[in-house]
Amino acid sequence: MAEAHWTFLTNHGHVLLCLARAPDRRIRELAEDVGITERAVQRILRDLTDGGYLSVEKEGRRNHYVVRDEAPLRHPVEARHTVGELLGALRA
């Protein structure tokens, strides 16, 4: 089988999963974890925050991210499921 260059989750999903596992990760660490630039992580964090999937709490000079488990998934195919259900399946 040829090596695939795609994944089942988007970079948004990867960042969300990383923050669910470690809510105090720094942007640099998230970029390394996901394999994208820090700038891309910043855009994703803004998308997730603006979309209501993530909130940010300042703790001194650091950010603490809170994933909104009750938020519905965006695509019509999965809209009856929540972020928490997706993360729960991936943690299992």
Range-by-range predicted roles:
Residues 1-14:
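Short alpha-helical segments that sit at the start of domains
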Residues 17-21:
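Short, locally clustered residues in the helix-turn-helix/winged-helix DNA-binding domain
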Residues 22-26:
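Short capping segments at the starts of secondary-structure elements
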Residues 29-32, 49-50:
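Alpha-helical residues within the helix-turn-helix
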Residues 39:
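Key DNA-contact positions within bacterial/archaeal DNA-binding proteins
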Residues 45-46:
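Short, hydrophobic-biased segments on the C-terminal half of alpha helices
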Residues 58-64:
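Short, Lys/Arg-rich nucleic-acid/phosphate-binding segment
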Residues 72-92:
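Amphipathic alpha-helical dimerization/coiled-coil segments
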